[in-house]
């Protein structure tokens, strides 16, 4: 509100949003606005009034303004208009005046700085006792003295809460928020005592751990105590609004208090973690994780209501858990048929530096309103302790607030002083109601401080001496509130001390019980009952040929009145003809048959990824688009009335958040088949944190299993270093302890069985698939229906396909993926070379490989052939396994490597060079 504002006057400046909106409303229907406004707008000559379409601002010459105001408005109406503009200015800008910093380090602006004094709006001190009468759909109804109005708005907007709502496009939602904020909230004496008790327990538990286990890392929430109370209050409010389940995601700070105070983990269980150092029973033989990464779930009851609470496990990688929580919530909503997204909700707790520093925050926020990822809004708490480890706020962001990312989705933001617990709870109440009423994200930023260093063993005085000199002499939030209650007569001087003594006694009892407490493993319950951590037997995944024919034919049916692209008509006719003639099928058909068979038996399927509806390589076409009206038709959802649901969506251009969301979705129900597909496998490393910290390790760290399928197009076809490699070697490096399947299938039958195995198996492991590109249309990359038929199963190793005399074999080549077909075609009729394929690389089937190699015990040369450079692909992982298999087969020999030389880049950029390299490695492998 600078010079431009003063030039354009108090009414029609850039801040007069309500006038602009009212004017547009008047143009649409004059009778829809107040009579005074009708006269005012009618008094403006049309040829002198412009509505700038690009900015949606009213442009009215000054002389017209003055003439219209003088002719059409009484002094009372004019003062009301001025007061309206003042109200709007407060709403937009007064957050800069709010008392948000409990440490008082910030130099606050004044009303004069922001031009929020009454003189700016054409009012003066002589009018303070005049009555203001406002009835307006935008600013509400006000009938009071001007002085009372100013006092009211000073209290609301320049106190302990500062708000940013102007980014909200929904006028109804924005007005609702302002009205809620401007409404008084009162707490009864009993409410106040309960709040004080909550603060005592939050601080008391932290101090108890600090005393009993000095120096142990716990990432105390002290200084931000209000955040724990706010979370707990949000849950109680949600229960009253009909929410039946909440999933919480957060980082390490304050987690131990969240586990106990909010989620309901027994204090003795957390204390036992400190005493024993073990978080899971030893007999499970898992790595476990540090105590401040662990999740927990329980039920909370309030009066006659019950809610299920889950705190998601997470790593130290800040904000990584955000999309996982969202995906899990969406899955639970889908299980309940909660299409209104009102029964299950998410709460995410962020740190200030992480919220504005981690890209996954922006990715997750951007995807949240999209149909495939919408969960009806998330309640966000940002715990702003004004530091990022040792970095000051100025080092971690350029913006005033840490919450700017939230404006990507026009989320309302409430900033609140963490020392004012009642203000924190008022903001929380508004946020909870807003999320439930409007189904949108909302952010509550609690500005607080961190009592200790980043952890309890860290010395913050090295880098923040000024700040910590203030903190060490500061009253805690609990003490501040207790003093307020004593002053107001709610409690006496002894009440606070008694609360602390009683809670300390409770913790002493919990400590004694913790000494003999046996850790429990809470997993494989609910929908996961019947799932095993290990496979008990090979799973038959084939189905009858009749079923394959019936499903395949149904998939090829297109409604007569649906104007599909003519090329797709031919494609579907060709698929149908192939099935009818019992001819070998391609990859896309096999995938669709796997999906269809699972849907028919009641398994819901969810597939997302960039371009997944059609498929990057135009092979899937599971969503048909009407060429005339743009409507869609999904054959997989039109198999029968009794079938399960097939959900396919083209994701936003994100790997990290989208993969995280699908991983989270897979955690909720093991009976769902959940898939994420990369556009090219090369881009999967944009989600490396999800692979490293969750998919590969969540079972051993947190006892969390997942059956997620990851499809990564991978093959060296001359498309350059960014469209060739899914970095297969990285997945093999992550593979251990039977934590996942890593596969590089070459046949349609293999993908058919792999997909079905994910559901029919009695265990759940992530499935990593190096999926094909050119093989999607390769003449040899086909499978007979018999290979998908009854009593068939996935074959992790495929022997030489031609009939050979093993006594004549002079060379055995093992390989995986597309290079097999290159070798097969170049070999031709050479009957002295056998080629064996590994369809599954991990777990390595040593006994099966050894049994095949034993047939070739007279062979002198064993080769591993791959397209990838030697330092990439499979070689480094598999060489020891292959040689062990040779030993088990009784063959005294070792495998030799044939492939590209070591390289810093996965592939060359030149097609010509690629072709030369490919021919060289093929000829070397075949010895021609």
Curated annotation (Swiss-Prot):
Its cofactor is thiamine diphosphate. Keywords: Glycolysis, Oxidoreductase, Thiamine pyrophosphate. GO terms for cellular component: cytosol; oxoglutarate dehydrogenase complex. InterPro entries: 2-oxogl_dehyd_N, 2oxoglutarate_DH_E1, DH_E1, KGD_C_sf, ODO-1/KGD_C, THDP-binding, Transketolase-like_Pyr-bd. GO terms for biological process: glycolytic process; tricarboxylic acid cycle. It is an enzyme of class 1 (oxidoreductase). One of its GO terms (molecular function) is oxoglutarate dehydrogenase (succinyl-transferring) activity. Transmembrane segments: none annotated. It catalyses: N(6)-[(R)-lipoyl]-L-lysyl-[protein] + 2-oxoglutarate + H(+) = N(6)-[(R)-S(8)-succinyldihydrolipoyl]-L-lysyl-[protein] + CO2. E1 component of the 2-oxoglutarate dehydrogenase (OGDH) complex which catalyzes the decarboxylation of 2-oxoglutarate, the first step in the conversion of 2-oxoglutarate to succinyl-CoA and CO(2). Belongs to the alpha-ketoglutarate dehydrogenase family. NCBIfam families: 2oxo_dh_E1, PRK09404.1, PRK12270.1. Homodimer. Part of the 2-oxoglutarate dehydrogenase (OGDH) complex composed of E1 (2-oxoglutarate dehydrogenase), E2 (dihydrolipoamide succinyltransferase) and E3 (dihydrolipoamide dehydrogenase); the complex contains multiple copies of the three enzymatic components (E1, E2 and E3). This is 2-oxoglutarate dehydrogenase E1 component.
